[in-house]
Amino acid sequence: MSDSKMDKLARMAPLPRTPLLTIWLAINMALIAQETGHKRIHTVQAATGGGSMLGDVNISAILDSFSVSYDKRVRPNYGGPPVEVGVTMYVLSISSLSEVKMDFTLDFYFRQFWTDPRLAYRKRPGVETLSVGSEFIKNIWVPDTFFVNEKQSYFHIATTSNEFIRVHHSGSITRSIRLTITASCPMNLQYFPMDRQLCHIEIESFGYTMRDIRYKWNEGPNSVGVSSEVSLPQFKVLGHRQRAMEISLTTGNYSRLACEIQFVRSMGYYLIQIYIPSGLIVIISWVSFWLNRNATPARVALGVTTVLTMTTLMSSTNAALPKISYVKSIDVYLGTCFVMVFASLLEYATVGYMAKRIQMRKQRFMAIQKIAEQKKQQLDGANQQQANPNPNANVGGPGGVGVGPGGPGGPGGGVNVGVGMGMGPEHGHGHGHHAHSHGHPHAPKQTVSNRPIGFSNIQQNVGTRGCSIVGPLFQEVRFKVHDPKAHSKGGTLENTVNGGRGGPQSHGPGPGQGGGPPGGGGGGGGGGGPPEGGGDPEAAVPAHLLHPGKVKKDINKLLGITPSDIDKYSRIVFPVCFVCFNLMYWIIYLHVSDVVADDLVLLGEE
């Protein structure tokens, strides 16, 4: 009741005549005064802006009015045009980028913008936008946005939930939240470690198709920002780009946004830990080319150590990378270094093998020289006996002179000397047969040629101990010495002297024969004709026996080169090949890996 009502009531009431009536009036007046005081207090609070009042605007009343007939389960404009949701991002940091897991982790602000007409209110001075806490999210509809390639994510809640809502008087809503997301990033490591990776974050509605929600970049090309303080140990952020697309799935067509960030790998770590050490290992393997080829322990130990070191380096490098099937650029470099180190080891194996073969040839040649010297001395004795005939001499026909088994060849061996006289084959064969078959003591006297018998006319065979001197145009000494070691190597001393198997001089008299064929005294039988096969008789004799001086020069070579030549060539060929490979490798891979994505906004040009 107001004061005027109280005055009116007092005038109308008659004056009390008893104390009880006075007490009743006092109580009523006290109750009326208390009610009036409460009303005045509420009026003062409203005038001073207390509670949820801003001037004459009640903020709480505005927020409470949003819940009247509002259903957060239904999107705005349901049944009408789709809701357009604008998106912006600002990347604060990128903490990791893993080649093994094929993912990257980034921390960013994620903002969404949309309009809900049900949240519009009348514009008042000073109240154009309402900033409310994250609890208000539970009372309104929000887009069901999710990250398609997300592996793991979490919200930041220190010290409170890092999220806010702004409601504009027109019904436009802004939602901002801080997120940390680990997203998958398929990588192509073909040019590793000179590669450039393009990682992306894809944004899409989980349940609403394009008939209900369409996403767009809210600020056009400037919707994505990256802090200039972003840094990674092995990568540099080159730039970013943004795309909008439509994805068709079995449940319908969906609107999707993609933010792509390109990274460039820093090569400092790999240069220090892999490239330079592997190059030095290759260079160390070349030290063996300057060591003496007889220093087998040093050269073998150096070669094996470098090969094992390269194997360990390759294994440790690939252990930190995913098991992929294609070849990476670092595999090309390490593989080439391994091949060159292994080739250095094989080079010494080749040098050792050639030195062993040459040493075996020297030993065989020295054995041949020793045996030839002994037989030459025996032939000198035979020539002396020809000049001074003895009763044991068996003189044949015009074809030659024969010395029996007891001749100058010593026990068990015989010497048959045939001296051609320039007669034809028939004449030589006829006299030879007559002398040999009848043993006529009065055979026609023949003139024995005094042509010296040289070392070049010696032919040795393995397995027979016999010697013969054959004419007519040249004299040949044949003897056989059993040499199982030489025979096991695919050759004989006879081959060494004659220059190989199957030559025209390889058909000597059989074992134990003291004379030649029936037509010739001691194997002469040919008159003055050339040896079998025709041509120059000295052509059948090996050149290294006709020219002993040249033998000493060529015997130290195999296939025209010496072991020392291989070391000399390797000192030049290996470094040149490695330098050429490095030039080609770095030029090609640095060029082909320098790829920048189209429409890329470089960092610092935002």
Curated annotation (Swiss-Prot):
Give disulfide pairs as residue numbers: C185-C199
Q: Where is the signal peptide?
A: 1-44
Gene Ontology cellular component list = axon; chloride channel complex; dendrite; GABA-A receptor complex; membrane; neuron projection membrane; neuronal cell body membrane; plasma membrane
Bilayer-spanning residue ranges: 269-291, 297-316, 333-356, 569-590
Q: Which InterPro entries match?
A: GABAA/Glycine_rcpt, GABAAb_rcpt, Neur_chan_lig-bd, Neur_chan_lig-bd_sf, Neur_channel, Neuro-gated_channel_TM_sf, Neuro_actylchol_rec, Neurotrans-gated_channel_TM
Q: Which residues lie on this side of the membrane: Cytoplasmic?
A: 357-568
Tissue expression profile of the protein: Expressed in different parts of the brain: the mushroom bodies (alpha, alpha', beta, beta', gamma lobes and peduncles), the neurons projecting to the columnar-type neuron LC9 optic glomerulus, in interneurons connecting the paired olfactory lobes, antennal lobes, PDF-expressing small and large ventral lateral neurons (LNvs) of the circadian clock and lobula columnar neuron 11 (LC11) (at protein level). Expressed in all major ON pathway medulla neurons (Mi1, Tm3, Mi4, and Mi9) and in OFF pathway neurons (Tm1, Tm2, Tm4, and Tm9).
Q: What is its induction? A: In large ventral lateral neurons (lLNvs), undergoes daily rhythmic degradation which is inversely correlated with the activity of lLNvs, which is involved in the circadian clock. Degradation levels are increased in the early hours of the morning and mediated by the E3 ubiquitin ligase Fbxl4.
One of the Pfam families matching this protein, by short name: Neur_chan_memb
UniProt biased composition (Low complexity): 381-395
Q: Which UniProt keywords apply?
A: Cell membrane, Cell projection, Chloride, Chloride channel, Disulfide bond, Glycoprotein, Ion channel, Ion transport, Ligand-gated ion channel, Membrane, Postsynaptic cell membrane, Receptor, Signal, Synapse, Transmembrane, Transmembrane helix, Transport
- UniProt keyword Chaperone, yes or no: no
Chain ranges on the Extracellular side, renumbered to this chain: 45-268
Query: What does gene deletion cause?
Result: In lobula columnar neurons 11 (LC11) results in a reduction of visual responses to the motion of small objects. RNAi-mediated knockdown in neurons leads to dis-inhibition of male aggressive behavior. RNAi-mediated knockdown in neurons in the alpha/beta mushroom bodies enhances learning. RNAi-mediated knockdown in mushroom bodies enhances appetitive olfactory learning. RNAi-mediated knockdown in PDF-expressing neurons results in decreased sleep but does not alter waking activity, circadian period, or rhythmicity under dark-dark conditions.
Map out region (Disordered) in residue numbers. 376-451, 482-542
GO biological process, any: monoatomic ion transport
Where is this chain compositionally biased, Gly residues type?
Answer: 396-425, 499-536
Effect on the protein upon substituting M360I: Decreases sleep latency
Q: Where is the composition biased (Basic residues)?
A: 430-443
Other remarks on this protein: Resistance is thought to be due to insensitivity of the cyclodiene/picrotoxinin binding site on the GABA(A) receptor-chloride ionophore complex.
Subunit-structure text: Forms oligomers. Interacts with Nlg4; the interaction mediates Rdl clustering. Interacts with Fbxl4; the interaction mediates Rdl degradation.
Provide the function of this protein.
Gamma-aminobutyric acid (GABA) receptor voltage channel subunit. GABA, an inhibitory neurotransmitter, mediates neuronal inhibition by binding to the GABA receptor and opening an integral chloride channel. Together with glutamate receptor GluClalpha, plays an important role in the visual response by regulating the activity of ON/OFF-selective neurons. Plays a role in promoting sleep and sleep latency by regulating the activity of peptidergic PDF neurons.
Tell me its family. Belongs to the ligand-gated ion channel (TC 1.A.9) family. Gamma-aminobutyric acid receptor (TC 1.A.9.5) subfamily.
Q: What is this protein called?
A: Gamma-aminobutyric acid receptor subunit beta
Instruction: Name the species this protein comes from.
Output: Drosophila melanogaster (Fruit fly)
In the UniProt record, the gene name given for this protein reads Rdl
